[in-house]
Amino acid sequence: MIETDKLATEQRIIAATPASSHEEVFERALRPRQLDDYVGQEKVRGQLEIFIEAAKRRSEPLDHVLLFGPPGLGKTTLAHIIAREMGVNLRQTSGPVLERAGDLAALLTNLEANDVLFIDEIHRLSPVVEEILYPALEDYQIDIMIGEGPAARSVKLDLQPFTLVGATTRAGMLTNPLRDRFGIVARLEFYDAEQLSRIVRRSASLLNAQIDPNGALEIAKRSRGTPRIANRLLRRVRDFAEVKADGQITAAVADAALAMLDVDPVGFDLMDRKLLEAILYKFDGGPVGIDNLAAAIGEERDTIEDVLEPYLIQQGFLQRTPRGRVATLLTYRHFGLSVPDTGRTERGEWDTPDGK
């Protein structure tokens, strides 16, 4: 068994967060530029088409937009598309960068009419900055303090009408006053294999990589429902195809490349398997407490809860119960193990989503 550490966690090939600034540059080159080119998220895309067209006809700024959902699903891409479809400029920042009220005021006062301000990780705004944002969103005004001490006074500045697009992976951490100021709220969902296959084929075309439909589907099925992961795997499979094959990405070539990268047919890597195997072999399938599990695999509790578990739970391989983590029937089948007769089904620990 290969041991992993925090650095390895951050560098997982199937991580949904950007691995480096270099990867972010690569992502920008592959981003769709119009809603018509945006694959998936049909409901969100349909809503935005109507709202954007209505705002353009009235020559008004688009209502403020909140995009939330797991990382890597296209929130930043949608923000850029919104600005491009509206025909305006986009200014981009993130919640942690805006440390002081003056940082936000400088951005707001430099916006032109109907511009888009995109704040990523908006749930990480400081309370001081958030207070400045409220009147800006409602009345296109901000209050700034001039002077210090007893001579200090508040001055109200008028702003150009603008659209705030906020993105977050943790909508529950937004304060109610901030959430209520967004007129358009959209949740981005995980993609299915067919949608990801279309994304892979489009990206391969932009990269001048030769890929057949089955090769694209093989990559898509292991991409954990996330376009960012699909594009990252495509790059690595392309490298493999150029060196070990004739450059053509087929299903067999993709399978061999992904096996070399330790990405299995359901998108698990070594860390996923390490966690599930610990539950199966060290704790007899569970239940096991999170602290015991963290000690057993040498990972931090937060890493397990925030990085490893969400996908495993979402796909039905892991259950959180009041007594601890439990491997599901699907996990036993995935590892080719017989299911022990321990009465867990009667206790509700192995119920499948349909109750069977």
From Swiss-Prot:
User: What GO molecular-function term can you cite, just one?
Assistant: four-way junction DNA binding
Q: Which reaction does it catalyse?
A: ATP + H2O = ADP + phosphate + H(+)
Q: What is its EC number?
A: 3.6.4.-
Q: Name one GO cellular component term.
A: Holliday junction resolvase complex
The text of the family note is: Belongs to the RuvB family.
Residues the entry annotates as binding Mg(2+): T76
- Name of this protein: Holliday junction branch migration complex subunit RuvB
Task: Show the domain comment.
Answer: Has 3 domains, the large (RuvB-L) and small ATPase (RuvB-S) domains and the C-terminal head (RuvB-H) domain. The head domain binds DNA, while the ATPase domains jointly bind ATP, ADP or are empty depending on the state of the subunit in the translocation cycle. During a single DNA translocation step the structure of each domain remains the same, but their relative positions change.
Top-level lineage group: Bacteria
Annotated region (Head domain (RuvB-H)), positions in chain: 265-356
What is the native source organism of this protein?
Answer: Burkholderia lata (strain ATCC 17760 / DSM 23089 / LMG 22485 / NCIMB 9086 / R18194 / 383)
**What InterPro entries does this protein map onto?**
AAA+_ATPase (IPR003593), AAA_lid_4 (IPR041445), DNA_helicase_Holl-junc_RuvB (IPR004605), P-loop_NTPase (IPR027417), RuvB-like_N (IPR008824), RuvB_C (IPR008823), WH-like_DNA-bd_sf (IPR036388), WH_DNA-bd_sf (IPR036390)
NCBIfam families this protein is in? PRK00080.1 (NF000868), ruvB (TIGR00635)
Where, per UniProt, does this protein localize?
Cytoplasm
Q: Indicate the quaternary assembly.
A: Homohexamer. Forms an RuvA(8)-RuvB(12)-Holliday junction (HJ) complex. HJ DNA is sandwiched between 2 RuvA tetramers; dsDNA enters through RuvA and exits via RuvB. An RuvB hexamer assembles on each DNA strand where it exits the tetramer. Each RuvB hexamer is contacted by two RuvA subunits (via domain III) on 2 adjacent RuvB subunits; this complex drives branch migration. In the full resolvosome a probable DNA-RuvA(4)-RuvB(12)-RuvC(2) complex forms which resolves the HJ.
Which Gene Ontology terms describe the biological processes this protein takes part in? DNA recombination; DNA repair
